């Protein structure tokens, strides 16, 4: 046990020790240690998680005869229910693709897709700043991989030119909206690149984009009009859609490969049908949430400008606004100060972000008012 204790002490010395906070949620507010604060750290981008009207409308349609609260099994055994197929068909239809497949979480999706679809003769080329879950999936695949510099497509092209002919298939891996910087990948350019090389597939994670961007809330791929050109388009239900789980839209043959070879899918008890029914209910309504998307973009543009004025650093183009302070100690102190002012802001430190880029990740939601965000900016 001494070795474990020493590890924790080392984390504390570097201001990298983490703990799980005790929180009470009240809509867009959080209470911690008897202090009520505006939640500036949520991924509930459309503000749907505490929407009582939506919740009551969903419950009333069942009249007390609710879907099961558990699946009790993997979908490949006895854990499949009609609502799963209904949601997969709805997602595929909205994206105008052949098929969709559901997963228990974005993490399950990202650690399972690449190992299922690659061989030891495959190549993965991933953006330097892709999410930890994608990195874990790459490692589990046990195939050759390189990281291209963040959003540097000349570097990616060079890697493709040097390596594609040596491998049976190549996967380009990126997020659309990057979770820590809030900047956006150029999906049109990535599509053009992958079309130049044989047996090359594009895998895009839209976890922080689905619901928020695009005319119908289908993400950056919809906004860029490239949905049909992305081989594996992943999204999650646990952020803007106020639910749980994830999906991939893809060709039917890729779906069948995943069903047969993706371990997190095969060996996990499926999500509760009740949860999947709620996801279906929300996903149906995505196109009608344009007012929320517009309001969120207005709030985001204002806050990005305010933070850039103070730091001269603003990579973000989205509702994720990084307030980059650099050092761990300064970031922890500023987060504490903002919490004392009534704003639940959290420090993000290495290894989650690169060394010397510690930041407060400010995350806006559509249920915030313009006055609340303006008042917050005063305290920055």
From Swiss-Prot:
<protein>
    <recommendedName>
        <fullName>Putative 8-amino-7-oxononanoate synthase</fullName>
        <ecNumber>2.3.1.47</ecNumber>
    </recommendedName>
</protein>
<dbReference type="InterPro" id="IPR001917">
    <property type="entry name" value="Aminotrans_II_pyridoxalP_BS"/>
</dbReference>
<feature type="binding site">
    <location>
        <position position="179"/>
    </location>
    <ligand>
        <name>pyridoxal 5'-phosphate</name>
    </ligand>
</feature>
<dbReference type="InterPro" id="IPR015422">
    <property type="entry name" value="PyrdxlP-dep_Trfase_small"/>
</dbReference>
<comment type="pathway">
    <text>Cofactor biosynthesis; biotin biosynthesis.</text>
</comment>
<keyword id="KW-0663">Pyridoxal phosphate</keyword>
<keyword id="KW-0093">Biotin biosynthesis</keyword>
<dbReference type="InterPro" id="IPR050087">
    <property type="entry name" value="AON_synthase_class-II"/>
</dbReference>
<feature type="binding site">
    <location>
        <position position="18"/>
    </location>
    <ligand>
        <name>substrate</name>
    </ligand>
</feature>
<dbReference type="Pfam" id="PF00155">
    <property type="entry name" value="Aminotran_1_2"/>
</dbReference>
<feature type="binding site">
    <location>
        <begin position="236"/>
        <end position="239"/>
    </location>
    <ligand>
        <name>pyridoxal 5'-phosphate</name>
    </ligand>
</feature>
<dbReference type="InterPro" id="IPR015424">
    <property type="entry name" value="PyrdxlP-dep_Trfase"/>
</dbReference>
<feature type="binding site">
    <location>
        <position position="352"/>
    </location>
    <ligand>
        <name>substrate</name>
    </ligand>
</feature>
<dbReference type="InterPro" id="IPR004723">
    <property type="entry name" value="AONS_Archaea/Proteobacteria"/>
</dbReference>
<comment type="function">
    <text>Catalyzes the decarboxylative condensation of pimeloyl-[acyl-carrier protein] and L-alanine to produce 8-amino-7-oxononanoate (AON), [acyl-carrier protein], and carbon dioxide.</text>
</comment>
<feature type="modified residue" description="N6-(pyridoxal phosphate)lysine">
    <location>
        <position position="239"/>
    </location>
</feature>
<dbReference type="GO" id="GO:0009102">
    <property type="term" value="P:biotin biosynthetic process"/>
</dbReference>
<dbReference type="GO" id="GO:0008710">
    <property type="term" value="F:8-amino-7-oxononanoate synthase activity"/>
</dbReference>
<comment type="subunit">
    <text>Homodimer.</text>
</comment>
<keyword id="KW-0808">Transferase</keyword>
<dbReference type="InterPro" id="IPR015421">
    <property type="entry name" value="PyrdxlP-dep_Trfase_major"/>
</dbReference>
<dbReference type="InterPro" id="IPR004839">
    <property type="entry name" value="Aminotransferase_I/II_large"/>
</dbReference>
<feature type="binding site">
    <location>
        <position position="131"/>
    </location>
    <ligand>
        <name>substrate</name>
    </ligand>
</feature>
<feature type="binding site">
    <location>
        <begin position="106"/>
        <end position="107"/>
    </location>
    <ligand>
        <name>pyridoxal 5'-phosphate</name>
    </ligand>
</feature>
<dbReference type="GO" id="GO:0030170">
    <property type="term" value="F:pyridoxal phosphate binding"/>
</dbReference>
<comment type="similarity">
    <text>Belongs to the class-II pyridoxal-phosphate-dependent aminotransferase family. BioF subfamily.</text>
</comment>
<feature type="binding site">
    <location>
        <begin position="205"/>
        <end position="208"/>
    </location>
    <ligand>
        <name>pyridoxal 5'-phosphate</name>
    </ligand>
</feature>
